[in-house]
Amino acid sequence: DKPFEEGGIEARPLARGKYILVGASLCGGRAYAVLEKFFRTFVVQAGGEDKALYEVLKKLARAAMNQENPVEVSTLFNGTRTDPTLRDSITNISENNFTPEGITYGVLHGMIKELYDMYQQIHQGTGIQVSHLVASGNGMRKNKVLQEISSEMFGADLSLAVYQEEAACGAAVSSAMAF
């Protein structure tokens, strides 16, 4: 059988003739780093200290979590695997939500929405449904708001991967399965 592949969803081989369906964004967590750089540049230009603002961003995002009519951010800074010319956009801006809090929450929501849209392609093509999320990466590990957005959007409980070096661990497990 040929595994499902469509619209940027790839079937990557596992051991024993199995496949894993992968929807991989080109920007992912880097979108949050771009946002942090934006705010940091502003702070420095305004005479503030040049230091990481991730803790501040977490507070801003938390403050906007239940905002009515939130800012919508598409985090396609580098396009997609199928169309690298696509770019980011910010929509649904009003005078009430065009705030640092609203933009920060919008970026986090947009990061997960890109992944959710990929999941929807897989679901529509295969019938596979999410029953539980296992998340990896420092962006997810260090940001409870991002975890909550993920769980809410996918409608499933979320756990963090047990090991922090996820790629190396996955390669080791895959190699061990081949024997």
Question: What feature does the model see in each segment?
Answer:
Residues 39, 172-179:
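Short, hydrophobic alpha-helical segments
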